[in-house]
C-alpha cells in the first residue's frame, strides 16, 4: 500500500513526529502558547526510544544503525524558527537530510541554541546528507510528519519534483532575486 503526498518544506521522522503528535494533541485540548512546541520537545525527549533505521540516498546505503530523528526537506526553517536543515536550498533540486543519532539530554540542552542559529551540524551526533532520492526503512516502523501534519509510517521514499510550483512575481523581484521553487513527492 503506497500513498503519494507532497511537501513544501520539511518532513520529520521518529522523534520529530512524536513531538508533532503531542503538540497536536495539546492544541486540540485548547492549549496554546509560544513555548508549547518546546515543552512537547522536552517531554518527548524522555519517552522516545531510538529506532533501527536504514537510509539510502540516491540508491546508496548511507546509514544503518539506531537513529533518534530524521529531517528531510528543501527549506531551512520549521517548527517556530528551528533550522534542522540550515544548508538547504529550495531550488537546487536536492533534498537535505539531517540524521540525529541517539544523544543524551544534557548534551542537546547545552547546544540547543544551534537548532535556531544554523549551527546544528556542530553537534557531533547529527549527520548531514544530501540527495535527490531518499529511502528509509526501520524496525519497528517510525512515524512521519510532513510540514507539521502526521501522515503515516515507514517505509518511506522522498524525491524532488523539479520546478513543480509556478510563482508569479514582478520583473523587479526577478531582478533582485532568482529562486524558482521545487516541491517534494513522498511515496
Regions found by a protein language model. Give the residues of each.
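ATP/nucleoside-binding phosphotransfer catalytic cores, i.e., glycine-rich phosphate-binding loops
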Residues: 57-59, 64, 89-90, 99-187
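Exposed beta-strand and adjacent loop surfaces of beta-rich binding modules
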Residues: 50-52, 94, 141-143
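Catalytic core of DAGKc-family lipid kinases
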Residues: 1-68
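Short acidic/glycine-rich loop or secondary-structure boundary segments that cap or lie
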Residues: 16-19, 63-65, 78-81, 105-108
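Glycine-rich phosphate/pyrophosphate-binding beta-alpha loops
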Residues: 12, 16, 71-85, 150
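Gly/Ser/Thr-rich active-site loops/lids in small-molecule metabolic enzymes
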Residues: 27-35, 78-80, 86-107
